[in-house]
Amino acid sequence: MGNTLISHGGGAPEGYNVTDAGTRVATKQVLRKYWACTNSSDTPMYLALWQVGEGGVNTSVVGEGIYLAANGGSFELNNVNMYYDEIWAIHDSAGAVKRLCVQKGQ
């Protein structure tokens, strides 16, 4: 991710407990200006960019979407590649809860 200046104001850091069934890590936010996450777990995760209204269910699938490597894999949305709908995360460690750290700006 590098050093990114968030000149439009940041939000408080957040963390999400991601399950092997999938967890929503961002809601639809039309005013989103920045969103970044880091996989702080020992297991790879996958992000699904999901459009609200496409069935109303979690669409994250292990092995598909945006890959986040274990122990620090990261992804960033900014003014170049912004996405405004829901974001889901999933991993394949059966029965385990893994941590995803998030920073957002509005």
Where are the predicted features?
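Short, surface-exposed beta-edge/turn micro-motifs
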Residues: 31-34, 44, 84-85
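Short, surface-exposed beta-strand/strand-loop-strand elements in extracellular ectodomains
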Residues: 40-64, 100-102
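Terminal connector regions
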Residues: 84-106
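Beta-sandwich interaction modules
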Residues: 26, 69-84
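Surface-exposed ligand/attachment interfaces on beta-rich extracellular proteins
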Residues: 5-30
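Beta-strand-rich, repetitive solenoid scaffolds
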Residues: 37-38, 48-50, 68-69, 78
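Tight coil/turn sites that cap or link beta-strands
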Residues: 21, 63-64, 70-73
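Asparagine-centered strand-capping/turn motif at beta-strand->loop junctions
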Residues: 36-41, 91
